[in-house]
Protein backbone atom coordinates (compact mmCIF):
# COMPACT_ATOMS: atom_id res chain seq x y z
CA UNK A 1 0.00 0.00 0.00
CA UNK A 2 1.27 3.47 -0.88
CA UNK A 3 0.89 6.44 1.45
CA UNK A 4 -1.63 7.94 -0.99
CA UNK A 5 -3.74 4.77 -0.78
CA UNK A 6 -3.40 4.84 3.01
CA UNK A 7 -4.61 8.46 3.14
CA UNK A 8 -7.58 7.62 0.93
CA UNK A 9 -8.41 4.65 3.17
CA UNK A 10 -8.35 6.90 6.26
CA UNK A 11 -10.72 9.36 4.62
CA UNK A 12 -13.04 6.55 3.58
CA UNK A 13 -13.20 5.07 7.09
CA UNK A 14 -13.64 8.48 8.73
CA UNK A 15 -16.57 9.12 6.39
CA UNK A 16 -18.26 5.84 7.28
CA UNK A 17 -17.45 6.33 10.97
CA UNK A 18 -19.32 9.64 10.90
CA UNK A 19 -22.26 8.07 9.07
CA UNK A 20 -22.44 5.31 11.68
CA UNK A 21 -21.81 7.14 14.96
CA UNK A 22 -23.04 10.68 14.37
CA UNK A 23 -25.74 10.34 11.73
CA UNK A 24 -27.07 6.85 12.52
CA UNK A 25 -27.18 6.21 8.76
CA UNK A 26 -24.48 3.69 7.76
CA UNK A 27 -23.92 3.02 4.07
CA UNK A 28 -21.94 -0.22 4.45
CA UNK A 29 -22.35 -3.32 6.60
CA UNK A 30 -20.54 -3.81 9.92
CA UNK A 31 -18.47 -6.55 8.29
CA UNK A 32 -17.36 -4.27 5.43
CA UNK A 33 -16.45 -1.55 7.94
CA UNK A 34 -14.47 -4.03 10.05
CA UNK A 35 -12.56 -5.22 6.97
CA UNK A 36 -11.59 -1.63 6.14
CA UNK A 37 -10.35 -1.14 9.70
CA UNK A 38 -8.33 -4.36 9.53
CA UNK A 39 -6.72 -3.16 6.30
CA UNK A 40 -5.88 0.17 7.93
CA UNK A 41 -4.37 -1.42 11.03
CA UNK A 42 -2.26 -3.77 8.91
CA UNK A 43 -0.89 -0.80 6.95
CA UNK A 44 -0.13 1.12 10.15
CA UNK A 45 1.62 -1.88 11.66
CA UNK A 46 3.86 -2.06 8.61
CA UNK A 47 4.34 1.73 8.44
CA UNK A 48 3.94 3.19 11.97
CA UNK A 49 5.44 6.46 10.73
CA UNK A 50 2.25 7.05 8.73
CA UNK A 51 -0.02 7.16 11.79
CA UNK A 52 -1.51 10.58 12.56
CA UNK A 53 -4.06 11.75 15.18
CA UNK A 54 -6.84 11.82 12.57
CA UNK A 55 -6.48 8.10 11.85
CA UNK A 56 -9.61 6.08 12.69
CA UNK A 57 -7.36 3.71 14.64
CA UNK A 58 -6.68 6.54 17.10
CA UNK A 59 -10.39 7.12 17.76
CA UNK A 60 -13.10 5.13 19.50
CA UNK A 61 -16.27 6.49 18.00
CA UNK A 62 -18.17 9.60 17.10
CA UNK A 63 -19.25 12.55 19.18
CA UNK A 64 -22.97 13.24 19.18
CA UNK A 65 -23.74 16.56 17.48
CA UNK A 66 -27.09 17.16 19.15
CA UNK A 67 -26.91 20.64 20.66
CA UNK A 68 -29.48 19.78 23.31
CA UNK A 69 -27.20 17.04 24.63
CA UNK A 70 -25.31 17.66 27.86
CA UNK A 71 -21.72 16.43 27.77
CA UNK A 72 -20.46 14.44 30.77
CA UNK A 73 -16.79 13.75 31.43
CA UNK A 74 -15.82 10.07 31.55
CA UNK A 75 -14.08 9.11 34.79
CA UNK A 76 -13.36 5.69 33.26
CA UNK A 77 -12.86 5.38 29.47
CA UNK A 78 -15.44 3.43 27.46
CA UNK A 79 -13.41 1.83 24.65
CA UNK A 80 -15.02 -0.27 21.97
CA UNK A 81 -14.69 -4.05 22.07
CA UNK A 82 -11.87 -5.32 19.88
CA UNK A 83 -12.97 -7.59 17.04
CA UNK A 84 -11.52 -10.93 15.98
CA UNK A 85 -12.54 -12.76 12.82
CA UNK A 86 -10.94 -16.22 12.87
CA UNK A 87 -10.38 -19.10 15.27
CA UNK A 88 -6.65 -18.40 14.99
CA UNK A 89 -7.23 -14.85 16.26
CA UNK A 90 -9.07 -16.23 19.28
CA UNK A 91 -6.39 -18.86 19.91
CA UNK A 92 -3.63 -16.24 19.77
CA UNK A 93 -5.47 -14.02 22.23
CA UNK A 94 -6.13 -16.90 24.66
CA UNK A 95 -2.46 -17.91 24.55
CA UNK A 96 -1.37 -14.33 25.35
CA UNK A 97 -3.70 -14.20 28.33
CA UNK A 98 -2.53 -17.60 29.59
CA UNK A 99 1.10 -16.51 29.36
CA UNK A 100 0.35 -13.66 31.74
CA UNK A 101 -2.19 -15.55 33.87
CA UNK A 102 -1.75 -19.35 33.61
CA UNK A 103 -4.83 -20.04 35.74
CA UNK A 104 -7.09 -17.60 33.90
CA UNK A 105 -10.75 -18.49 33.51
CA UNK A 106 -13.02 -17.02 30.87
CA UNK A 107 -16.56 -15.66 30.89
CA UNK A 108 -18.28 -15.90 27.50
CA UNK A 109 -21.38 -13.97 26.53
CA UNK A 110 -23.34 -13.16 23.39
CA UNK A 111 -22.48 -9.86 21.70
CA UNK A 112 -25.59 -7.71 21.46
CA UNK A 113 -25.50 -5.12 18.69
CA UNK A 114 -26.67 -1.91 20.29
CA UNK A 115 -25.01 1.14 21.79
CA UNK A 116 -23.04 1.42 25.00
CA UNK A 117 -24.44 3.21 28.02
CA UNK A 118 -22.94 3.72 31.45
CA UNK A 119 -25.15 4.09 34.49
CA UNK A 120 -24.04 5.71 37.73
CA UNK A 121 -25.65 4.76 41.04
CA UNK A 122 -25.11 6.83 44.20
CA UNK A 123 -25.84 5.95 47.83
CA UNK A 124 -29.10 7.46 49.05
CA UNK A 125 -28.43 9.87 51.89
CA UNK A 126 -29.47 8.52 55.29
CA UNK A 127 -30.68 5.15 53.97
CA UNK A 128 -28.73 1.90 54.32
CA UNK A 129 -28.27 -0.46 51.37
CA UNK A 130 -30.03 1.86 48.96
CA UNK A 131 -28.56 3.35 45.78
CA UNK A 132 -30.30 5.53 43.20
CA UNK A 133 -29.65 5.92 39.49
CA UNK A 134 -28.10 9.38 39.17
CA UNK A 135 -26.48 9.32 35.73
CA UNK A 136 -26.84 7.68 32.32
CA UNK A 137 -24.23 8.58 29.72
CA UNK A 138 -23.52 7.38 26.17
CA UNK A 139 -20.03 6.42 25.01
CA UNK A 140 -19.53 9.60 22.99
CA UNK A 141 -15.86 9.80 21.99
CA UNK A 142 -15.05 6.97 24.39
CA UNK A 143 -12.16 8.76 26.07
CA UNK A 144 -13.22 12.17 27.35
CA UNK A 145 -16.94 12.89 27.05
CA UNK A 146 -20.27 11.17 26.57
CA UNK A 147 -23.79 12.56 26.32
CA UNK A 148 -26.26 12.52 29.18
CA UNK A 149 -29.48 10.65 28.37
CA UNK A 150 -30.60 10.35 31.98
CA UNK A 151 -34.25 11.27 31.43
CA UNK A 152 -34.58 8.67 28.70
CA UNK A 153 -32.87 5.98 30.77
CA UNK A 154 -35.57 6.44 33.40
CA UNK A 155 -38.22 5.12 30.99
CA UNK A 156 -36.33 1.97 29.91
CA UNK A 157 -37.77 -0.90 32.01
CA UNK A 158 -34.57 -3.00 32.00
CA UNK A 159 -32.58 -0.20 33.65
CA UNK A 160 -32.94 -0.44 37.42
CA UNK A 161 -33.70 2.88 39.05
CA UNK A 162 -32.58 1.69 42.49
CA UNK A 163 -30.17 -0.97 43.78
CA UNK A 164 -30.20 -2.62 47.21
CA UNK A 165 -26.44 -2.45 47.73
CA UNK A 166 -24.24 -0.92 50.47
CA UNK A 167 -21.80 1.04 48.30
CA UNK A 168 -21.21 4.79 48.00
CA UNK A 169 -20.95 4.71 44.21
CA UNK A 170 -21.26 2.12 41.46
CA UNK A 171 -20.88 2.57 37.72
CA UNK A 172 -22.16 -0.09 35.34
CA UNK A 173 -21.80 -0.41 31.58
CA UNK A 174 -24.31 -2.08 29.35
CA UNK A 175 -25.73 -2.26 25.85
CA UNK A 176 -28.99 -0.56 24.91
CA UNK A 177 -30.69 -2.37 22.05
CA UNK A 178 -34.00 -3.03 20.32
CA UNK A 179 -35.47 -6.48 19.71
CA UNK A 180 -36.14 -7.57 16.14
CA UNK A 181 -39.84 -7.82 16.99
CA UNK A 182 -40.04 -4.20 18.16
CA UNK A 183 -37.95 -3.09 15.19
CA UNK A 184 -40.30 -4.79 12.73
CA UNK A 185 -43.34 -3.36 14.52
CA UNK A 186 -41.87 0.15 14.28
CA UNK A 187 -41.19 -0.17 10.55
CA UNK A 188 -44.67 -1.56 9.89
CA UNK A 189 -46.22 1.41 11.66
CA UNK A 190 -43.98 3.82 9.77
CA UNK A 191 -44.95 2.27 6.43
CA UNK A 192 -48.65 2.51 7.25
CA UNK A 193 -48.19 6.18 8.10
CA UNK A 194 -46.19 6.82 4.93
CA UNK A 195 -43.08 7.70 6.93
CA UNK A 196 -39.42 6.74 6.60
CA UNK A 197 -38.45 3.32 7.95
CA UNK A 198 -35.31 2.52 9.94
CA UNK A 199 -32.34 0.71 8.37
CA UNK A 200 -31.64 -1.66 11.26
CA UNK A 201 -32.34 -2.16 15.00
CA UNK A 202 -29.01 -0.69 16.10
CA UNK A 203 -29.58 2.63 14.34
CA UNK A 204 -33.15 2.86 15.59
CA UNK A 205 -32.04 2.14 19.16
CA UNK A 206 -29.39 4.87 18.95
CA UNK A 207 -31.83 7.44 17.62
CA UNK A 208 -34.45 6.45 20.16
CA UNK A 209 -32.08 6.80 23.11
CA UNK A 210 -31.17 10.33 21.97
CA UNK A 211 -34.75 11.55 21.59
CA UNK A 212 -35.49 14.87 23.26
CA UNK A 213 -38.95 13.60 24.22
CA UNK A 214 -38.71 10.71 26.69
CA UNK A 215 -42.25 9.61 25.85
CA UNK A 216 -41.03 8.60 22.38
CA UNK A 217 -38.21 6.62 23.95
CA UNK A 218 -40.66 4.89 26.25
CA UNK A 219 -43.10 3.80 23.53
CA UNK A 220 -40.39 2.23 21.35
CA UNK A 221 -39.47 -0.42 23.89
CA UNK A 222 -35.70 -0.19 24.29
CA UNK A 223 -33.92 -2.90 26.27
CA UNK A 224 -30.69 -3.04 28.26
CA UNK A 225 -28.08 -5.72 28.95
CA UNK A 226 -25.44 -4.94 31.61
CA UNK A 227 -22.03 -6.51 30.98
CA UNK A 228 -19.40 -4.67 33.03
CA UNK A 229 -18.65 -2.92 36.32
CA UNK A 230 -16.87 0.32 35.36
CA UNK A 231 -16.31 1.64 38.86
CA UNK A 232 -17.02 0.15 42.25
CA UNK A 233 -15.66 -1.68 45.28
CA UNK A 234 -12.71 -4.04 44.92
CA UNK A 235 -14.79 -7.18 45.46
CA UNK A 236 -16.79 -6.41 42.31
CA UNK A 237 -13.76 -5.47 40.24
CA UNK A 238 -11.60 -8.54 40.89
CA UNK A 239 -13.01 -10.50 37.93
CA UNK A 240 -15.79 -10.47 35.35
CA UNK A 241 -17.49 -13.32 37.21
CA UNK A 242 -17.42 -11.35 40.47
CA UNK A 243 -19.11 -8.45 38.73
CA UNK A 244 -21.90 -10.69 37.45
CA UNK A 245 -22.62 -12.17 40.85
Feature roles, as predicted:
Residues 1-245:
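RNA/tRNA-interacting regions in translation and RNA-turnover enzymes
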Amino acid sequence: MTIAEYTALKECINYHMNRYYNEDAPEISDYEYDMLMQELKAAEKEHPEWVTPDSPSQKIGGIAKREAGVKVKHTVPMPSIEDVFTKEDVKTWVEKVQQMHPDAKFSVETKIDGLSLKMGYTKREGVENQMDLTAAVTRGDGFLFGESVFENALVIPDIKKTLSLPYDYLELRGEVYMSHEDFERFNEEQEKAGKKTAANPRNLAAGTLRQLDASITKERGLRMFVFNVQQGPAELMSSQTAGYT
